[in-house]
Amino acid sequence: MALRTLVSRRTLATGLGFRQQLRGLQTFSLPDLPYNYGALEPAISGDIMQLHHQNHHQTYVTNYNKALEQLHDAISKGDAPTVAKLHSAIKFNGGGHINHSIFWKNLAPVREGGGEPPKGSLGWAIDTNFGSLEALVQKMNAEGAALQGSGWVWLALDKELKKLVVETTANQDPLVTKGPTLVPLLGIDVWEHAYYLQYKNVRPDYLKNIWKVINWKYASEVYEKESP
């Protein structure tokens, strides 16, 4: 019940690494990174990447699995108050797992194409919807810097409107909470844990430098697959 209010079963399953069945309940595991922790330096330090992946993302996975198991037990017992109480934990930790699983794919070392501008249909779509790649970067940087507290800034494909849009989400809310037709192409984590060890409290510097390791190839692949 609570899961359906977060995202569809299909959305949850996509790219998140199921690992086993636990009493009929599917659980999740921490995905491996497709590069070494230090591979994104100097844009993002190896220390940040290791802490971000091994500690923060792992905590979301652990707490998500725990909340899902508690939900499973509560439903089996007909414990409606506990079911309702678990909704926020499932949304927060499940969203954290979804968002970070996308985030790691949105990054790539420079030697593997990180930072190279998007080409093909995504490049054309960016020019059409925002005027230029530079204008898109400025818009996402501005909205990410202005986001109060913690959250994410996204480049998304709106499949209903058939256009690219920039959205922000608070805390660990996944993009789907902003609309069921939004497909995340690129998400940038603006929680302090994503940059504080290196950039202190200067979020704009982090936002400026992360574009040097953005994996536009992955974003283009998602766009090609999902574009109507």
Curated annotation (Swiss-Prot):
Mn(2+) binds at H52, H100, D189, H193. Pfam families: Sod_Fe_C (PF02777), Sod_Fe_N (PF00081). It is found in: Mitochondrion matrix. Keywords: Manganese, Metal-binding, Mitochondrion, Oxidoreductase, Transit peptide. GO terms for biological process: removal of superoxide radicals. Disulfide bonds: none annotated. Binds 1 Mn(2+) ion per subunit. InterPro entries: Fe/Mn_Superoxide_Dismutase, Mn/Fe_SOD, Mn/Fe_SOD_BS, Mn/Fe_SOD_C, Mn/Fe_SOD_N, Mn/Fe_SOD_N_sf, SOD_C_sf. It comes from the Eukaryota. Its EC number is 1.15.1.1. Belongs to the iron/manganese superoxide dismutase family. This is Superoxide dismutase [Mn], mitochondrial. It comes from Prunus persica (Peach).
